[in-house]
Design a protein with these regions (language model features):
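Active-site microenvironment of metallo-dependent hydrolases
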Residues: 1-100
């Protein structure tokens, strides 16, 4: 498991040349906490969700029911089944990372 996580995080960060993919003191803390028991075929099922900013227009989404929590830059962005109210509204949840 440890090597698989490294291949999907640290190794990709190195390959793209971005300062990401490692949990190290003083670095960004972008973390996804998931329940491996809930990793199943439901991820491939079709789901729609409304986009409130566009009058409720429906969009296709993936439902990651195995995902329990998401932290971006050390701040809780998602927990349980809801997003943080400040996500997308305030600064501090991350930034664009340029390769190289």
């Amino acid at each position: 498991i440890e090597k698989a996580v490294w291949r999907l995080t640290g190794e990709l960060g190195e390959w793209f040349g971005v300062d990401a993919g490692l949990l190290t003191v003083g670095k960004r803390a972008d973390i996804v906490v998931l329940d491996p028991q809930r990793l199943d075929d439901s991820l491939n099922q079709y789901h729609e969700a409304p986009m409130e900013a566009f009058g409720g227009l429906q969009r296709m989404v993936n439902r990651g029911s195995a995902v329990n929590h998401v932290l971006i830059n050390g701040r809780v962005a998602f927990s349980g089944e809801s997003f943080a109210a400040e996500l997308g509204q305030t600064r501090g949840f991350g930034q664009f990372l340029r390769a190289g």
